[in-house]
Amino acid sequence: MKGRNYPLGIQTFENIIRGNYVYVDKTALAYQMVHENKYCFLNRPRRFGKSLLVTLLQAYFEGKQELFKGLAMQQLEHEWLSYPVIHLDISKGKFYDMASLHATLDSLLADYEARYSLHVEYEKAYNVRLQNIIKAAYAQTGREVVVLVDEYDAPMHDSMKSPDLQEQIRNAMRNLFSPLKGEERHLRFVFLTGISKFTQLSIFSELNNITNISMLDKYSDICGISRNELVSIFKADIRELANENEMTYDEALSELQHHYDGYHFSGRGEDVYNPYSLFNTLASNEFDDYWFSTGTPTFLIDFLQEKHLDMLDLDDITATADRFDTPTEKIIDPVPVLYQSGYLTIKAYNPRSKIFKLGFPNTEVKTGFSNSLFRYYAPDNLGEKDALYAAYYDCLVEHDDMEAFIPHLQTFYKKFPYTLVNNNERHYQAVFYTCLLMLGADIRAEVPTADGRIGMLLFTKKSIYVFELKYEHSADVAMQQINQKNYAIAFAEDGRKVYKVGINFSADRRCIESWKVIPC
């Protein structure tokens, strides 16, 4: 039985502390941030702890010293002054029309107008109302004002499919934030969070002294949970997870890493786990796709299809730092949005060339994203997918029998609607790769070796499968390439059985025509 409470669905620092929920101490980084900067921006994926950080800052600036007992902030802060805090949580609304935006902003501003005895004048522009609130808070308390804006970009994301609506929303939001520069002398600290950096809102051009800490090494783990934090704080929880799943401690830790670790938000920063998925797993003792199941923007999947991009395109992407700053308002390149949304992360960084390598952070994201993308390939009958998963689990997971599994895959291909089949080699490779990812397989594509690139590799606990996929040739031709290039020799010392798998796809049949599975 769990001896502690996990803050599932609780994002407010004060509620977490007073409710005796698990809290991983980030107060030292928060203290450093507010004492090194006056204007800060942080972007992180959804459900990654941004709101918790914002409410932590609110509690700190409101001087609630009792909430920080035993935390790093207690030793770092000596004065504990109380400042007026304006906390605008933009995520409270859904912004599918201008009426929704006006209702949300009116409600947020009216709360503070009432607090400082200002007459609520809905007809006034948002910038005037926010400016009046800042001035009143400063005049009535004698202290500089703190402005915390959580999910500032929520209206922009909700209106992504409607350019005209987004333009109206952009103008309204630009107007709202404009006093943050003019009222600088009345402000102690300004902090904005979001998923994306919407450059055309003018926040980043008008507030020319704003510090974007999103990709700074020293703040890389200000949200999320590092490996050191995991093993030092949650050791007993991991042991219980291991016992419930009939694993050793090391196996459970490895499985957590495989599923939920792998996020890097700077070139040389800390490697972090997704806190939402991690807490759900430890609370339930079940490995599952918790974060991904909370929602994938359909516009991203649609955009990838429009640009004819697939899962093979999204791993091992090369990017410069400039690519991360591409304006999100007009999505020409999906990579910045995929990175900011948490579907891609930094896998490697070369400080000399300043080149980043991007890829999927972990199994949860890779499998979940392939599942979302696969609906463009899959048969309409959802039961077919379930049948394929059952075959995969029985043939490969339980019995390591590729020869028995491929006929099930062949049957699945045969049921694809003709409208979803592009008759070319790349299409069949992408579908094969995406399908196995969706099933949860540890599969890798285009793996470099000294003699070329292995088409695909599939790893199980007992075996390694070396694939070569051909189109309008034969399984013999595919097998011949594996042998000529000595692809399998790289795994001779692995300890697992190694199999060579040659597969040929037919244009006429639009599916797998022939295959060979040969042990090394």
Placement of each model-derived feature along the sequence:
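Structural motif
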Residues: V146, S463-Y465, Y499
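Metal-dependent nuclease catalytic cores in nucleic-acid-processing enzymes
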Residues: L176-E183, P336-L344, Y433-L437, A441, ...
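Conserved catalytic cores of phosphodiester-cleaving nucleases, focusing on short active-site segments
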Residues: F432, M456-Y471, K485
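Mg2+/Mn2+-dependent nuclease catalytic core
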Residues: Q166-N171, Y471-A488
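Domain-level recognition of nuclease-like catalytic cores that cleave nucleotide substrates
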Residues: A490, D494-C520
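Phosphate-binding site recognition
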Residues: M1-N424, L439
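Active-site metal-binding core of divalent-cation-utilizing nuclease and nuclease-like domains
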Residues: A137-T141, Y433-K461
